[in-house]
Design a protein with these regions (language model features):
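Positively charged
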Residues: 2-242
């Protein structure tokens, strides 16, 4: 069972995402794009007892929200499809997905968000959530959800600087296989439950903007433009100083 989170910790997690996105997402000609060209050596990824030794990062650009690959239901994951994109194993795919999630500053990242047609996502890594526990999730399925719901502000790496209040079940009982092919069943509470539900929607071709009214989305878009202008100011000031 996940550790209980205080409202302060939850807000801190959301602020963490907002802060990191502000630092790594360039604004180009008024259109949000995140393009990464560098590669770097990073620390090993610890997935439970399995330590994956990392070499150079393979970083994929985030595809735009209108890309059909983000809007279609993803077929069940099969191990024999890994070679199509140059992956030797689930563990290697998990490593690359972790690199991308960390690079873009997310709390979760689905494979189709970076153009990979796999029914899998990675989530976790934030020190305030389950002590930074990372889950690599293949073929996710939600068995049950709580009757009680909670409204919280969410972000999505596919929609930089856009934050929406989303009402979700407080907990969810889930099933999936991990990077070792082991079947996992657990009940997630608080932020992990929210992240799992968010990423699972990506598996079925939905994005979080589908869950709110047109009016609510318009208001969030206006707030987003204010954030972008502020980020542009900081980026321009940084270029002048350096």
């Amino acid at each position: 069972m996940a550790n209980k989170l205080t409202p302060e910790n939850i807000e801190a997690a959301v602020q963490h995402l907002e802060n990191i996105q502000s630092g790594v997402t360039p604004i180009l000609d008024g259109v949000d794009r995140t393009v990464v060209e560098d590669a770097e050596v990073v620390e090993p990824l610890d997935l439970g007892n399995q330590v994956i030794k990392k070499k150079e990062k393979r970083v994929f650009p985030l595809i735009p929200p209108s890309d059909p690959r983000l809007l279609m239901q993803i077929a069940p994951f099969m191990d024999d499809t890994l070679e199509q994109f140059g992956f030797a194993s689930r563990k290697e795919l998990a490593e690359v997905m972790y690199d991308n999630m960390a690079k873009y500053g997310g709390l979760g990242l689905s494979a189709n968000q970076v153009g990979l047609p796999y029914r899998m996502f990675i989530m976790g890594g934030h020190p305030e959530i389950e002590d930074g526990k990372v889950r690599c999730v293949f073929n996710p399925f939600i068995n049950d959800i709580s009757e009680e719901s909670v409204m919280l502000k969410e972000g999505c790496l596919s929609f930089p600087f856009l934050f929406l209040g989303i009402k979700r079940p407080k907990w969810c009982s889930v099933r999936y296989t991990n990077e070792k092919g082991e079947e996992i069943e657990e009940t997630l509470h608080g932020m992990p439950a929210r992240i799992f539900q968010h990423e699972n929607e990506h598996m079925n071709g939905y994005v979080f903007t589908d869950l709110v009214s047109k009016l609510k989305l318009e208001r969030a878009e206006k707030a987003k433009q204010k954030i972008i202008k502020e980020v542009q100011k900081r980026q321009n000031a940084s270029r002048i100083i350096t």
